């Protein structure tokens, strides 16, 4: 027997075919959300207050400082917030200190800063009662970037961009004459030397002294001439720059200095963020720039004089190892330049300069200038950064240094929840800061308190806006646990500060070599977002700078053996190493088993020897995301189909009694455990009590833990979320163990579908184009039955004419329609309802009309009751029938928070039990999707020699052209697993080989080709050829025919065009388009076409008359003029074309004649008058014979919706 047994949780053992020893467990799969939010609460919030505070008034008399903050207990628990449509949030209190510098008085006060949304343990937020996820964003990292391009003459031109987190961009470029320019914030070009002069180095000699002489710099100096000799060079440059940035304004050196200081050197306006400083230091540091260059000077230890590297030495990794400690010192090869007093920044400029030989001409010395190891805490740009960037830019033209790839994951970073929230909070705080400053100058300094200065509205509004309407705050995908998990691990390049769909080219969307182990190369949506929305790989994590790291096993550099020491590397760091694949064969002592090893060096796949290997992958599945890692035999599937398989697993509907896959990949337990839908124990202990609603566990220290189970809760997508206990009384449970299965789980494992018996065969053409034939048993035995819960809401409000009332007494409704309502007119739990049934009886007062004498008498006798009311009951919409699962009533008397003007709210939940039926979409895990085309009686299905009928028939044509052979391997191994009675695990890229499958097939006593003879259930004859039959994990997807099928009888019309609305949600009509019209024209079906263009569309009067004729049984009248035709006529008249309609005798027909109307256009008032007459006639008829007209009234009240 190949394979070995592995336990997944306490309730499942699988035979695993993996060969590679796992040295690292998978991390917690939602830590990207939880870690980031916890960082925000612990550090991010405090950093932000420290940034904004202290706030001082314009005179500097008052200052408001931040002392501390605390989050109090949340108002609602998670479940209460869900029920009350509220936020799960905690009040934020901030302690502020107000200092009056004139009197020395200090006032401290606790100020309420609004309710702050809290993250649940599952990594989600509850906003207005709905679970939401904040998706992490992939953005370009702040830093210095260099790029190359080819101009129209075929010359290579270089460019550089300094990108801050917020603030002005700085760009360097050269023109066709090799003159270098700088642009500030995408404005007009400024010669680069002008910026250097503005920094305080006015003369040409000073500039050459700092930057060294090179061709482009000389050309620039020639162009940058001294025009106005009255001004010094520094002042002239400052004025020039000001003129380019603010054309038309009077230019002075002072205003230019303050403008440049505000643009670049004010930490409040220019922020590189720690990551920007880290990237800039890394890029401009001599440690990275000297590698591979030849020294043009001898470097010695400044203290001892000992030579570190002689002139002419090539700086390789070993030389750099001895050189690096010196380069980190503050005085090694540092040169200080003193700017003039007129400069923007007058502090001395410290640069680290080392001369190297030019690659083209060894005689030429080229300075390599570092930015002088600027402190990592410094957030804004320094003159040293600008000079060092210019030097890098000039060196590139000589072939020194390298350009950056913007799609490299070393240059793209993740903004997770914490940082996104911090940025949003900062916006709110800076708006508040303005208000505080204004109030400081207005209010009396002696009596003012912090509370009077603070207005928290902007802060609260910005947080509300972020959670409510940001592109990155999304309604959680709650179709099944895998969908939830994937949504929390999603990375989006879209959103504020990111890309837009239309501007994103192929390069951004493409798979990059740095995605390896960081972002899944397979899981991404099909369609316009392909490649812009990705998924985090299974082992990846995000470091403090927001870069994605992936773990590798360290290879000892002296023994060349693979150790169990794990290092997490970013994409930048990985570029320096050679990494071996996870499936490289090893000996027991960790040494490599083969002489040549397949490895990766940057973007190349190479074969190399053991002594060159630095690291080794930790696991074969570190390349892919969780959903992709759930696909067995992924290595045998084409990537396009694997993409569909990964995406469709997220759409699998939770079934009534799901089964974990017979052929899994071993990640099912971890995915279900971390998804947040399973019930997990918090402590070790023994189970004392179990029922469907709660589990009680006695801890070892004697305390009792009670766990409440989630029962039939409606998820975000209208699916049924339910938990079932899997422990028994007396069981010992460990901390972090699964106590109860959630939806789509079985025995603690992910169970998205079922394991039916599948045959690859045709059946009378019913398999054409991916259609699926299924056995009636799947319908009858509820194998693919799912429960769907829909929520409906009705509110009783105060109106101008009086309050609405929930009641059983509804006008013109028979007792039959009220049989399931209680005395308040609310439906009872457990009632079965159909489309159009009343769920909540509600009446709204009508406008008071002039009463007749008889009505006044009735009013006097019976009082209020004779008042006219309108029926505004909540009814079951089309296709919404089912069983009432729950009713929730909220009233002001019970202390429920309701929105203003609402006195009572009722929520009704209807559960539908949906069996699989023709038209439903199903799929396997390999992208093999199809729709059910026929349900075949069990006795007619093909059956196996032992009499077992097949469950599902798939078309064999779906395999060869799509190259997803994994489904066939799963089929064969699944059959063996079924016969052997075991569950199997075949991890991705490390699963069962063909020999393993052959052995399992043999062990199960199947034929060597794993096929079998099938017999026709109708005739009993065997089919000609042997058929591949086996077990495949097959899912029912959320695209169900019940949600899509739709037909319109009478419904609403668009106010503008007077044509029927579209779509199922609006109860709209089907579009009869251009091609469909051609089809009717081809058959000469003139009257059908006329009806479609008139009564069924926008002939306003005609359709009302037609409806009347149908109700009364009269012949249908002639159609009138469609509204769109009138529009056409008016359009042509507006163009000055006189258009007339003529009859057969060439006589003009007035459009009004065709409608027998007085007016050109049908008046809406006329329609409502007509409807009113209808209503009065109907009432008269109802009084004479109520029973006859009861069904008609229900329909007749509907045409009024067209207004």
Curated annotation (Swiss-Prot):
UniProt KW keywords: DNA-directed RNA polymerase, Nucleotidyltransferase, Transcription, Transferase
One of the protein's GO biological processes: DNA-templated transcription
GO cellular component annotations of the record: DNA-directed RNA polymerase complex
UniProt region (Disordered), positions on chain: 1167-1203
GO molecular-function term, one example from the UniProt record: DNA binding
Coiled-coil annotated residue ranges, if any: none
Protein EC: 2.7.7.6
Family annotation (InterPro entries): DNA-dir_RNA_pol_bsu_external_1 (IPR019462), DNA-dir_RNA_pol_su2 (IPR015712), DNA-dir_RNAP_su2_dom (IPR007120), DNA-dir_RNAP_su2_hyb_sf (IPR037033), RNA_pol_bsu_bac (IPR010243), RNA_pol_bsu_CS (IPR007121), RNA_pol_bsu_protrusion (IPR007644), RNA_pol_Rpb2_2 (IPR007642)
Organism domain of life: Bacteria
Enzyme class: transferase
Biased composition (Polar residues): 1190-1203
UniProt xrefs under PROSITE patterns: RNA_POL_BETA
Pfam families linked to this entry: RNA_pol_Rpb2_1, RNA_pol_Rpb2_2, RNA_pol_Rpb2_3, RNA_pol_Rpb2_45, RNA_pol_Rpb2_6, RNA_pol_Rpb2_7
Catalytic reaction annotation: RNA(n) + a ribonucleoside 5'-triphosphate = RNA(n+1) + diphosphate
Family, per entry: Belongs to the RNA polymerase beta chain family.
Complexes and interactors: The RNAP catalytic core consists of 2 alpha, 1 beta, 1 beta' and 1 omega subunit. When a sigma factor is associated with the core the holoenzyme is formed, which can initiate transcription.
Function: DNA-dependent RNA polymerase catalyzes the transcription of DNA into RNA using the four ribonucleoside triphosphates as substrates.
Protein name: DNA-directed RNA polymerase subunit beta
